[in-house]
Amino acid sequence: MASGGQFPPQKQESQPGKEHLMDPSPQHASPHYKPANKLQGKVALVTGGDSGIGRSVCYHFALEGATVAFTFVKGHEDKDANETLELLRKAKSSDAKDPIAIAADLGFDDNCKKVVDQVVNAFGSIDVLVNNAAEQYKASTVEDIDEERLERVFRTNIFAYFFMARHALKHMREGSTIINTTSINAYKGNAKLLDYTATKGAIVAFTRGLSLQLISKGIRVNGVAPGPVWTPLIPSSFDEEEVKQFGSEVPMKRAGQPYEIATAYVFLASCDSSYYSGQVLHPNGGAIVNG
């Protein structure tokens, strides 16, 4: 497992990055993980499930018995999406339906509705919604962030969470769960990722507020705030020297691997977390944060 200073210098030119081009490849599976049918019979929809944390979440959900659907960016993430589909087909339980991948730009309400409709048409319901897709871009100053980019980042990173939730909830029953991916940056700030950080703070507030709205319906809403994790967003966001040192800033002095984060989603999606709602888990390499 790479530690700080052990990633080869590398750079990808477009967001959200491609996992199959990364060196080393992110680790989506732990050799020590033991499935226990925690999600048997459930339908899970994961946005941005083609790579990184999303891929690992999909994989672990499939191991736990869930039928899985995920979204990806068409024309950019097709290869990663196909690799994830093959991975899920091999991991799924015999009584789970075949996984599906849905190409979508989630920054627009109509597209989110189409995604939800496609999942419901295929599988009948949604038991677990994971809002995970995101974009991030470096900027040295607030003046460098123009209106077009600001709107794009907010559409993908927080508008889509609202859109997906409002449409998925029509098909979610008591006992269902929503899990939102936020970030350590929401708690510590990040001068280089100002607009991204603002959206991640909004996701924390959205998670808390929505949990209060839905608690009477028996639907739980929680979040996960990863620290530095080796995903395609990293070589597509930072320069080669920053990539080389990625993860060295946290107490464990290394970046996390996707599988080290995905188990938090399994916990929050399953009945093991039945007394959790409005909470955020912090798999971040030992960084101390408030919240």
Swiss-Prot record:
Alphabetized CDD domains for the sequence: SDR_c1 (cd05355)
Region (Disordered): 1-35
Keyword field contains Lyase: no
SUPFAM superfamilies: NAD(P)-binding Rossmann-fold domains (SSF51735)
Annotated NAD(+) binding sites: 45-69
Gene3D superfamilies linked: NAD(P)-binding Rossmann-like Domain
Tissues in which the protein is found: Expressed in embryogenic cells, somatic embryos and seeds in the later stages of development, but not in non-embryogenic cells and mature leaves.
Keyword presence, Oxidoreductase: yes
GO molecular function: oxidoreductase activity, acting on CH-OH group of donors
PROSITE patterns: ADH_SHORT (PS00061)
Keywords tagged on the record: Oxidoreductase
Functional description taken from the UniProt entry: May act as a short alcohol-polyol-sugar dehydrogenase possibly related to carbohydrate metabolism and the acquisition of desiccation tolerance. May also be involved in signal transduction.
Family (UniProt): Belongs to the short-chain dehydrogenases/reductases (SDR) family.
Protein name in UniProt: Glucose and ribitol dehydrogenase
Source organism: Daucus carota (Wild carrot)
Primary gene name: CAISE5
